[in-house]
Amino acid sequence: MTTVTLPTVPSPPHSRDGADRRLPLPGRYTVAPGRSLVELTAWYGPLPVLRRRVTLGEASLTVPEGAESPSFRFEFDDRLFSAVLTSEEVDEVHGGRLQLTGDLDLNGLAFPVLLRLRVVQRADDRLLVVGHARPPYRLLRRATGFRLPWRRPATRLRLLVAAEFA
């Protein structure tokens, strides 16, 4: 019996140009007016009972130089839904997605929320993302006092966000 040694294929070197990164190069990026879409949907069981576009007042992405976590900030400015979503932790998950754990600041009270973003397009100076958060309406109402119109019963909300950071 003979032993055969097979050649090993070396692993490819890590990309130096950041092709495997999900975020743009370090810096601060904002969303230009008209380059975003935000929608608030209230659900009662399987039925959507309210669907409304929400104005995105300002949004920013800060990518630090080191190994620190980037930070996202979304300011929603609407008469029905005026809030600020600030990320505390940003994780890269499988399939080119980002998972933001942060606080939704409504009426001066912070409510924890999970925003899942899909990276649609990435360049060195630009990032296009689409994602959603699904906070439970009853807990949000009890914790922050946020209320929908009384004719709109709801069990959960969906906040849809699409933005191009440049």
Describe the residue ranges of each PLM region.
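Low-complexity, acidic/polar, glycine-enriched regions of mature
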Residues: M1-A166
